[in-house]
Amino acid sequence: MCARLEATKGDRPMNDAPVRTEVPQLDGKAIAELAEQLNQLLRLRTFPIGMKLFEDKAEMEAVPGLRRPPKGKTFTTCQLVTQSRMAGFTLGITTENVPPFSSCSSVIGLDSPGEIYTSGRKMEGVWFENREAAAAHQAQMPRVEPRYAGLAISPLRSARLDSPDVCLFYGNPAQMILFINGLQWRNYQRYEFSITGESACSDSWGHALKTRRVSLSIPCFAERRYGGVADDEMLMACPPEDLQRAVTGLQGLSKAGLRYPIMPFGPQAEPAEGMAKSYAGKS
């Protein structure tokens, strides 16, 4: 079964949303500064990006520097995400640019999946032995409500999305665990993340856009084959305020000597010497 992301704190039931305090909305410039700090703290390989959903296509097209994918061609969403995070493109995506009534379009709320998907016929004999398993995969996949005309993607450093609905970045497992440590630094909460399997974009931007919660995913075969995601890369998606919280936490961890890259102490060395520095005065 595909589990949904839940963030837990204390004895709160695991299916409750995490408690959030009201904070002023961060503008594009402030988020760009956070992205630069994140890059410095985690030494990311590619640009952190933002995503913003639009009910009005004209409003999306008014985003500064927006470009549209070539007419007459369709791409997977993960391909367009990679164009943004690697080449720095600000892209506007509609149903003209991704396969319509597919997982790509329905995960980001541009339409609903077609019968060939929901029935299980599409993935039967490919990703799943039988139609029932393929249909269950589709039924449990996180998706945004299908009421949007477009999605804009842009590097956070450009400050063109004011402000994005969610922020995303790719990184290796060491970078991801430090980011989570940063989220937990001041106000602890426990995280659980979902694994849909194939169509893992539903666990990252799909889940984050739908719930506005921190979402960590293991990119799937298609994201790696078509989107060019590297073998060691994972994907983090979160609202801007969680990015701010994590950066603050990473700065606090850095002051305690907990930084990226993580310096190996050595598997055959006595750990007491290293721990004595991290936990000085704690005995």
Which stretches of residues belong to each language-model region?
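Cys/His-rich short segments
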Residues: 1-5, 10-35
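Acidic, serine/proline-rich low-complexity intrinsically disordered regions
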Residues: 28-283
